[in-house]
């Protein structure tokens, strides 16, 4: 880990927390991202950031003040593990299917959700036999509007000291980082070529990202950086800074791009107040960088350490997720610097080859001189 000892820029923290709250107060599940997407688009309209949807409902936000510059893509997803309502059994009884990855032990009788729309409280009654991840729930009262999905009944957003707690840090924190970075670059009038990408249905197999990659919706020469919250694992520490994610459970990401991120981060440590970073392979899950990489895009990743991953709390109880505000603010500060450093990609990534060539020259000389017959 690398760290500066001074305090972080307060404006980044304020922007990050404000965006995180706006997004996290919206209910979302795979295929039901309307509220989070609407809030993201509303922010873009408020600040004059050009945004559009593709035919699959993924959001593209573009800040292009340097058209000849290599595009930088910042990718996050709008959904979080949740339930789809499959059918109604009675005035207050519903069958719900869970979409996402959570261990079976967490689906206990009495587990509470909120049916959407309407935020109607409901409790898990039983697991349906022979039906994978399907459960019967009973609502506290008969919903006035037919529900179509449900989310865990947890606090939406709470700021406690330096931590954001809420139902869906994953990956609305990533979405907040995308938008905060674009806004920061816009305020600086930076000459950058950045595409913010907010995809759908990541929790059920990167479905939004796969449609984007397969449709060729991004420039092939782009550098794609996946932004995530990732399960805290040994070797990284919450509050220790943004994590340069060199790989995930399925893939190792582009070496030169990871080196570029580290070079920019190292420069930022030297000049920034309170910036810190860590470097690790985060194998707790698979992120969208794997999907983009498999379709031929040069990909890298950043993440922050996540507590209660996918709402999996202690003692097999559903609980709010949490992240460090300092880590997320550091992610945004790094991304702002990365976007502005894109013209120096070759120079920064060329440092290692140049060092190795210097070592090679010395090696040839020293080895020849010390050769014993």
Language-model features, listed with the residues they occupy:
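N-terminal hydrophobic/helix-forming segments and targeting peptides
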Residues: 1-373
């Amino acid at each position: 880990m690398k760290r500066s000892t001074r305090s972080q820029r307060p404006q980044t923290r304020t922007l990050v927390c404000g965006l995180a709250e706006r997004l996290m107060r919206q209910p979302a599940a795979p295929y039901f991202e309307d509220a989070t997407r609407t809030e993201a688009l509303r922010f873009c309209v408020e600040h004059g950031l050009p945004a559009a949807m593709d035919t699959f409902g993924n959001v593209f936000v573009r800040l292009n003040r340097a058209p000849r510059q290599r595009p930088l893509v910042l990718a996050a997803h709008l959904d979080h593990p949740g339930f789809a309502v499959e059918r109604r059994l009675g005035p207050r009884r519903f069958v719900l299917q869970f979409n996402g990855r959570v261990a079976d032990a967490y689906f206990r009788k009495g587990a509470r959700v909120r049916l959407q729309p309407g935020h109607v409280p409901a409790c898990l009654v039983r697991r349906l036999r022979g039906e994978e991840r399907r459960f019967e729930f009973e609502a506290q009262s008969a919903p006035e509007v037919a529900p179509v999905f449900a989310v865990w009944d947890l606090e939406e957003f709470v700021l406690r000291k330096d931590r954001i707690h809420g139902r869906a840090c994953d990956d609305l924190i990533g979405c907040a980082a995308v938008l905060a970075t674009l806004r920061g670059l816009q305020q600086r009038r930076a000459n950058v070529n950045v595409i913010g990408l907010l995809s759908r249905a990541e929790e059920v197999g990167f479905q939004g990202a796969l449609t984007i990659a397969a449709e060729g919706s991004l420039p092939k020469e782009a550098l794609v950086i996946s932004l995530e919250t990732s399960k805290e694992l040994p070797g990284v520490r919450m509050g220790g800074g943004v994590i340069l994610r060199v790989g995930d459970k399925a893939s190792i990401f582009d070496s030169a791009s990871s080196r570029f991120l580290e070079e920019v981060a190292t420069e930022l440590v030297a000049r920034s107040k309170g910036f810190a970073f860590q470097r690790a392979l985060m194998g707790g899950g698979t992120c969208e960088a794997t999907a983009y990489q498999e379709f031929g895009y040069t990909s890298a990743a950043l993440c922050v350490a996540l507590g209660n991953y996918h709402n999996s709390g202690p003692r097999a109880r559903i609980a709010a997720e949490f992240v460090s505000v300092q880590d997320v603010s550091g992610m945004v500060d790094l991304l702002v610097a990365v976007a502005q450093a894109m013209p120096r990609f070759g120079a920064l990534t060329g440092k290692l080859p140049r060092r190795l060539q210097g070592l090679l020259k010395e090696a040839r000389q020293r080895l020849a001189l010390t050769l014993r017959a």
